Amino acid sequence: MEVEKELKTFSEVWISAIAAACYCRFVPAVAPHGGALRLLLLLPVVLLFIFLPLRLSSFHLGGPTALYLVWLANFKLLLFAFHLGPLSNPSLSLLHFISTTLLPIKFRDDPSNDHEKNKRTLSFEWRKVVLFVAKLVFFAGILKIYEFRKDLPHFVISVLYCFHFYLGTEITLAASAVIARATLGLDLYPQFNEPYLATSLQDFWGRRWNLMVSDILGLTTYQPVRRVLSRWVRLRWEVAGAMLVAFTVSGLMHEVFFFYLTRARPSWEVTGFFVLHGVCTAVEMVVKKAVSGKVRLRREVSGALTVGFVMVTGGWLFLPQLVRHGVDLKTIDEYPVMFNYTQKKLMGLLGW
């Protein structure tokens, strides 16, 4: 990877994305009501966001860019086309609009949330900081262990990859949130909620894992499908059907995301992963309702079963496509390149 060239391309991609988001902010002046005209005006930006990440070849720049633009930003723009979603608030400032469009963030703008924010204690904030630092140390430890990967059993490497994927995703999204918070000075909803503490699949996917993706899937898929199904089926099947569709859409979008990482035809394994979890989550909900008050697993047991199921199925269906195309090795190899480049630049700035 040519670092200077990749960083230059990265800058060009994001300058283009910011310019496109500025254009989107003023589309309502031409099409004040959501509908076909606004959708037509936004489609060029949707297409631009699809093609921009193809210019990047590195995992650590191309991956987040594809997630932010191709999936999250485009889904927000499609909602915006019909005057729905987080971008439809006419009081958003230009900077607020751009940040909401391009970054995986959601601002706390409810007065009750402001009151809640004021009630937070300093010790609680410090606990969050200490926990995040611990995650950074753990992440660095995983990278160090990779130096001995040739001597490690396959299942150990799969476990490391699962932790790597989680920690890398949370750290990357947290960096985006820090930029938005520093720029706008506003409080944000959390992007992850300690998914390793989940006690059920519903808890894991609905309340703990990648909450920005869950939120946008709820607005674009789950809620509309549930409204349609509510006319034809009972509540239990309405919820289960909408959930399964949302998981399927998530799987398809992960296939798209994986294409940007591998530049290879989809294998549909990752779609299978999310369809499987959609079915299992729906079954879990039905079973929990059927045995409510009769059977209750200890939190430690249900937590271990939940996280274990996610990791085992992840190693079976989620990771193989990335490993098959060498994305894992490419990702690992980029860390020393980034470290050496950053070290060189810092030493240059300090005159050493």
Swiss-Prot record:
Transmembrane segments: 13-33, 34-54, 67-87, 128-148, 155-175, 239-259, 267-287, 303-323
Family affiliation: Belongs to the wax synthase family.
Protein name (Swiss-Prot/TrEMBL): Long-chain-alcohol O-fatty-acyltransferase
Alphabetically ordered keywords of this record: Acyltransferase, Endoplasmic reticulum, Lipid biosynthesis, Lipid metabolism, Membrane, Microsome, Transferase, Transmembrane, Transmembrane helix
UniProt key word Transmembrane helix: yes
Function: Catalyzes the final step in the synthesis of long-chain linear esters (waxes). Has activity with both saturated and monounsaturated acyl-CoA ranging from 14 to 24 carbons in length, but C20:1 acyl-CoA is the preferred substrate.
Membrane topology qualifier: Multi-pass membrane protein
UniProt GO cellular component terms: endoplasmic reticulum; membrane
EC number: 2.3.1.75
Catalysed transformations (reactions): a long chain fatty alcohol + a fatty acyl-CoA = a wax ester + CoA
Protein's cellular compartments: Microsome membrane
Chief place of localization: membrane
GO BP: any one term: lipid metabolic process
Catalytic EC class: transferase
